[in-house]
Amino acid sequence: MHYEKKLSIELKEKLISVNRVSKTVKGGRIFSFTALTVVGNNQGKVGFGYGKAREVPSAIQKAMEKARKNMIIIPLFKNTIQHSVTGLHTGSFIFMKPASEGTGIIAGGAMRSVLEVAGIQNILAKIYGSTNPINVVRATLNGLKKIRSPEMISKKRGKIITII
């Protein structure tokens, strides 16, 4: 229990979007809210959550809890990614490319938030197709999941790192 509290303190949380949605029933409409959040530790660990509730704070709380449970680890190299990568989810297609020191995060919309909480400081990124925040976040995480460090590749191939 103590470990979870310590873990949650070092995590950086970011709210991407809050949306009001409605369900039409016989007596009229029932309104509820959805929240999309990302959580990361600024050292290559990132996750996203999507929560829905009748009130905004409850939706955000649910989204944050889901984000903490769905975290992935990204192998970073000098505050950027190891190699160029693409990600796809439904209509959103993203392209990310490592950048030199001092470039900053050149990315738009929801992708910028994901990269910031992941701890990536220098990157060039572009969204093609749909810019729907949910699809962009999922496409970004799909792309980040594809990143492999030289150590991972050498281990998989059974070769030494210098050959790769």
From Swiss-Prot:
The N-terminal domain interacts with the head of the 30S subunit; the C-terminal domain interacts with the body and contacts protein S4. The interaction surface between S4 and S5 is involved in control of translational fidelity. With S4 and S12 plays an important role in translational accuracy. Located at the back of the 30S subunit body where it stabilizes the conformation of the head with respect to the body. It comes from the Bacteria. Residues 11-74 form the S5 DRBM domain. This is Small ribosomal subunit protein uS5. The lineage of its organism: Bacteria, Pseudomonadati, Pseudomonadota, Gammaproteobacteria, Enterobacterales. GO terms for cellular component: small ribosomal subunit. Belongs to the universal ribosomal protein uS5 family.
